[in-house]
């Protein structure tokens, strides 16, 4: 049985924990090293059990604590070639640090790892699919302006899907963000709205998804209740019942539970 925990999930900072078969990894390090270590301790997870860190892309809310965390954990960090290049240019990584995701099989992990490209305004951005020995896949898919066919092919068939439900379009359009920022978020390389996220869910559940985690919610342009209602309403309209066909929860900004999946 695998374990998944959204340690941090919001526009302010992101970090996920995934473990299966005796191997444990982190996805992103968008808060301070101290916050990440505290979150692990709260879940009785030893930092020494982490064997790698996977990075989705180089935006600050996904890499803010990475440099210090790597100094503390002494583990490899993996990402796309473009992401690694950007992190070195930002001096978050040294020239010697960073392993291209194409070399992931060189690590002694108890599960497979696949990086898939996402549509986001950051070169080399992507999401991850983890495949344990029993074949029950987990996808982590946030920071995307649209669900492309590449993304859809990657996440269909996953038992557990972490998917972005970033904003309510009405709240964003009527909110205080500057117009250029609103346009960026709404673009095909921005962030996924509640409605766009919900549209994808029936297909995912019919393809075998049983655990849905809505993630990367905006604190300013969304609420957990609104994201949840939007998702469940669309699923219900498609004849899919919560509890019997799927389970769904919203990842909080911090303090998310450990899910046994």
Where are these regions (language model features)?
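Active-site neighborhood of phospho(di)ester-bond hydrolases with catalytic His/Asp-centered motifs
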Residues: 27-30, 50-58, 78-81, 139-142, ...
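Metal-dependent catalytic neighborhoods of phosphoester/phosphodiester hydrolases
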Residues: 64-73, 89-90, 222-229
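Structured catalytic core of nucleotide-sugar glycosyltransferases
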Residues: 5-15, 58-64, 88, 113-116
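Active-site environment of divalent metal-dependent phosphoester hydrolases
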Residues: 59-63, 84-86, 122-123, 147-149, ...
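Metallo-beta-lactamase
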Residues: 81-136
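Cap/insert and terminal regions of metallo-dependent hydrolase folds
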Residues: 149-250
């Amino acid at each position: 049985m695998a374990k998944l925990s959204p340690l941090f999930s919001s526009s302010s900072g992101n970090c996920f924990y995934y473990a299966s078969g005796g191997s444990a990894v982190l996805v992103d390090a968008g808060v301070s090293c101290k916050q990440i270590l505290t979150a692990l301790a709260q879940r009785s997870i030893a930092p020494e059990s982490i064997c790698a860190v996977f990075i989705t892309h180089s935006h600050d809310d996904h890499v803010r604590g990475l440099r210090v965390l790597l100094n503390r954990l002494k583990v490899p960090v993996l990402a796309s070639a473009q992401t690694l290049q950007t992190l070195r240019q930002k001096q978050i990584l040294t020239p010697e640090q960073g392993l291209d995701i194409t070399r992931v099989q060189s690590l002694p992990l108890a599960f497979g790892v696949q990086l898939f490209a996402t549509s986001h305004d950051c070169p080399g951005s992507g999401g991850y699919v983890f495949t344990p020995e029993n074949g029950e896949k987990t996808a982590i898919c946030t920071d995307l302006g649209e669900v492309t066919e590449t993304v859809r092919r990657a996440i269909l068939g996953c038992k557990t899907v972490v998917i972005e439900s970033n904003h309510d379009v009405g709240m964003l359009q009527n909110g205080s963000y500057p117009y250029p920022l609103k346009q960026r978020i709404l673009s095909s390389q921005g962030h996924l709205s509640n409605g766009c996220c919900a549209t994808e869910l029936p297909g995912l559940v019919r393809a075998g998804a049983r655990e849905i985690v809505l993630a990367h919610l905006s604190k300013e342009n969304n609420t957990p209740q609104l994201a949840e209602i939007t998702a469940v309403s669309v699923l219900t309209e498609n004849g899919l019942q919560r509890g019997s066909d799927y389970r769904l929860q919203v990842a909080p900004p911090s303090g998310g539970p450990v899910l046994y999946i």
